[in-house]
Regions:
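Conserved CoA-thioester-binding segment of acyl-CoA-metabolizing enzymes
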Residues: 1-49, 84
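Glycine- (often His-adjacent) and acidic-residue-rich active-site loop
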Residues: 50-84, 130
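Glycine-rich beta-to-alpha active-site loop
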Residues: 84-131
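Well-ordered beta-strand positions
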Residues: 114, 154, 158-160, 166, ...
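C-terminal long alpha-helix characteristic of the crotonase
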Residues: 117-122, 173-221, 246-252
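Hydrophobic, secondary-structure "cap" segments at the distal end of domains
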Residues: 140-150
């Protein structure tokens, strides 16, 4: 599910959960546990990457449909906890985006301190609204902190995914990297960030991201309504319609 490797104080966490590392309850809990384990003083920085041509395809919509609202009731808080663990990890966290990073995969990458995407055909975006599900407060504020308002509205309302150059121009990623060099470059960045005083880095990171968390607290009432919407029958109708349309397109 998650492959772990340590090298010179850098912990590499590789998502290896099915073909596209779609997010479900088990992957979320496993990754949360990995971030807790990364509190070990021997770990100086974390690199998060994926397998094959996908970093992560986001929330496992087929699992949502299969297991229904009771599963969603358990999963949504875990998704929030995962993003919070990534964002607030006091150590440098580098996303080595090895391919497609869609929806929750895009947001997971955005929660990292530095984002490097491999050159190629990978796409990144947030199609949640097109799927028919609203954004919880934390994912929304993470993306809003990375992408300027005009680009943000374009991504959200269109639901489109973008390729590497447009993603960099928007702020979704920080840099691009040639094929075959992704982990080397991510390690270079992680080592550079890890060379900074750990205490100073942690305090600076806390100050940098505290406005995101404050805004989430302010949106608590709205977030409760969003969570409730994830449990409603019409949301599952929206997801089914989106999946049906997506499957039909892939068969053409």
């Amino acid at each position: 599910m998650i492959e772990r490797r340590d090298a010179d104080g850098i912990r590499i966490l590789k998502l290896a959960h099915g073909k596209v590392s779609a997010m479900d309850l088990e992957l979320g809990e496993a990754l949360i546990a990995e971030f807790k384990d990364a509190a070990d003083p021997s770990v100086k920085a974390v690199i998060l990457t994926g397998t094959g041509s996908s970093f992560s395809a986001g929330v496992d919509l087929f699992r949502l449909i299969k297991d229904g609202p009771e599963y969603a009731r358990r999963f949504v808080p875990v998704l929030d906890e995962l993003l919070l663990a990534t964002l607030t990890c006091p150590k440098p966290v580098v996303a080595a985006i090895n391919g497609h990073a869609i929806a929750g995969g895009c947001i997971l990458a955005a929660a990292c301190d530095h984002r490097i995407m491999i050159e190629g055909n990978g796409r990144i975006g947030i199609p949640e609204l097109v799927v028919g599900v609203p954004f919880p407060a934390l994912p929304w504020q993470i993306i809003a902190a990375r992408v300027a308002d005009g680009h943000l509205r374009d991504l959200v309302f269109s639901g489109r995914s973008v390729q590497i150059d447009e993603a960099k121009a928007m702020g979704l990623i920080d840099e691009k990297c040639p094929s075959g060099m992704l982990l080397n470059r991510a390690t270079e960045v992680a080592q550079k960030l890890a060379s900074i005083s750990a205490g100073a880095f942690a305090l600076t990171k806390e100050a940098l991201y505290s406005p995101i968390l404050e805004r989430v607290r302010q949106l608590a009432d709205l977030n409760a309504r969003v969570t409730d919407a994830w449990l409603q029958p019409h949301t599952y109708e929206n997801i089914r319609a989106y999946l049906d349309k997506t499957i039909k397109k892939s068969e053409i």
